[in-house]
Each structure stands twice: as C-alpha cells, then as structure tokens.
Amino acid sequence: VSGIEVAGSRVLITGASSGIGAASARLLARRGATVGLVGRRAEKLAAVLDDCRSAAPDSRMWVCDLGDLDAAARLALEAWDALGYVDVLVNNAAIPKVRAIDGVTMGDVEQAMTVNFFSPVAMTLAVLPRMRQRGVGIVVNVASLGGRLGIAHEAAYCASKFALSGWSEAMAIDLHDSPIEVRLIQPGPIDTDIWSRPGEERAVYDGPKEPPEVVAEGVVAAIEGDRFEHYLPDLKAFVDAKQADIDSYLAGVAAMINTGS
C-alpha cells in the first residue's frame, strides 16, 4: 500500500458540481491531475470544469443522475475511455435525508441507499476489472462521520453511509494483496449545500462547520498516502467514545436533542 502521486494522474470524481466534490476537483487539478467531473447540475459543473481546465486543460465533465445505477456504471466506463484510463475513482456524490424516524418512508431509504451506497458500488464494480488489468488504482469512498455514528433524524442517511463504510472496509481486505487500494473519507460537519436541500427537514446539528477545502486537502493526502481511513476534521475521538460505551452515547445524544442543546 503506497498511494499514487496526484500530479500526472487521472481522477474521476462524482458529486463534483459543489461542496466537497468541487473543492476536491479544483485542488486535484491545481496539483496536476486531469479530472473527470460527474454531477447532476450542468451549469454548476461547467463552472467547476472551467476552474479545473485553467490548470488541467484535458479535464472533462459528464452530467448524470447517479440514482440510475445502469447509467452510473455506463458512465464510469465512458469516462475511463474518454480520459484514457482512471487512476483514482472518488465516489463523493451524496444526498441528505433529514427526517425524524416517524416521518421516514421506504422511498426515502431507497433513495438514500441508491445514491449514497449503490451508485458508488456500481461505479466501482464497473472500473475495478480495468484497474486490475492496468495493475494500478485507488477507490476513494467519501462516507461521513454518520457512517460511524448514529445521528439524530438521519437514519436513512446514516444507513447509507454505514453501508459505504462497511463495504469499503471489506473491499480493502479483499484487495489487500493487490495493487488496487481503497481509501475511506469520513467528513464531519462541512459547510456545503447538503444542509439546505429543498424538501429536507432542518438538520438537528447547528454547530460549527469546516469549509469543504479541509476535506479536499484530506482527499489529496489520502490518495498520496497509505492510510485507509481519514477523519476530516479529526473527530475520531467521538467514534472511539461511542465504541467504548454505546449506551452512554445514545443516551447523551438523545438528551441533547430533547433539551435542544
């Protein structure tokens, strides 16, 4: 396990029209990578592409709804062909689902699982044989602190991110003795538009948020480094505390919600 130098690499990144994806794409381009951008919002994606092309002129973009899993898999191969190959796949696209459990529908859960978990799986399985054939590749999965901690009013979102964390961990074991590497990014509260999506309840969390550039720097470090899991910012102590005494964690979070603190 050794990482890949970003300069000169080709990186395909989903959810690239805003937030963590856009910040990561811009930074990767500035560091010398050719980037392939995937997103739903063509206008925003084109603006990010313009920024990337000023540093990496061969960068490309594809507009795609990753809720369509067949389209996601096809797109991964189309992007591979257009870029020549893909050294690094960054599965970053995600949607929120902010609902107290009594308001959650099966449709909410299916939508969160499809975009946040099944689409990264579809794209990974599409490119993995080609990465194997080339003998090089890194899959970077952007999960969430909510992929290690249960969060109030975010059961569907947490389920999708726990799934992505578990998948990444098991995949890293399966690929451990191969040249294909896996990285898992666990962002904490980051200042992106995921907090204010139309149709979502207001998130319970109302504390400080880090800029997406904090995660972008971490993504670059993860690609070039050799560690599997990266908490950005480093809130792993909360996860360790939960693991040490989960009953206290559950009671403590519930008490904070009930008192509004």
Model-inferred region functions:
Residues 17-18:
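Conserved glycine-rich cofactor-binding loop
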Residues 31-48:
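Conserved glycine-rich Rossmann-like NAD(P)H-binding loop of the short-chain dehydrogenase/reductase
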Residues 63-74, 106:
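The beta1-alpha1 cofactor-binding region of Rossmann-like NAD(H)/NADP(H)-dependent oxidoreductases
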Residues 100-101, 105-110:
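Substrate-binding pocket helix/loop in short-chain dehydrogenase/reductase
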Residues 124, 160:
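Active-site helix of classical SDR
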Residues 144:
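Residue(s) in the substrate-gating loop at a strand-loop-helix junction
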Residues 172-234:
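SDR active-site lid
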